[in-house]
Amino acid sequence: MRIALELAGQNKTYESLALKFFEHYIYIGAAMKNMGGRNYSLWDEDDGFFYDVLRYPDGSFEKFRVRSLVGIVPLYAAETLKMDDIEPFQEFKTNFLWFVNNRRQLTESCCHYLELEGKQQYELTIVDNKQMRRILERLLSPSEFLSDYGIRSLSKYHELRPFVFGHSEVRYDPAESENKIKGGNSNWRGPIWFPTTFLIIDSLRTLGA
């Protein structure tokens, strides 16, 4: 969305694309908190973390309680839209405000209006303050995600407590994997990824601002 608005400064066609990205963001954020209109959320209140969810043919759901980067990614989806910044883009501004005002059941959970120093702006974020604090408790814990060199792709919690589903398991295994699938690659089993660590830092700066 931000890239599309930047391009819209040279080509107004990109305004409609920016709006499309905004609407998709809202739809995805709302679905994460109310899957299939059944009031089932990817967020787990007991664990304070986001999980993947499996939906069975009978309509029931089951969370995959794997503490991985998947549960941290919602932090990335944070952006600030200042009304002064979108003033030059009248098509985007008009449709943006219409969507915010007429789709409140969707936008109220991930699009928040603020006034700071007399300036109007909207904060776009999937996580609320309470969820962010609970995620950070795990993210900044050396016994979970925080290592001396960055953020682990899988919590160290799973070193002694692997997640088991059927005949498969996910265990913290940051070196060469015991499983030879894909040549023994263990990227999702604990190693540090430089790009994701950067994205986490950048997202926290955005949320903090």
Please tell me what each predicted stretch does.
Residues 1-209:
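Acidic, mature catalytic/reactive cores of soluble proteins
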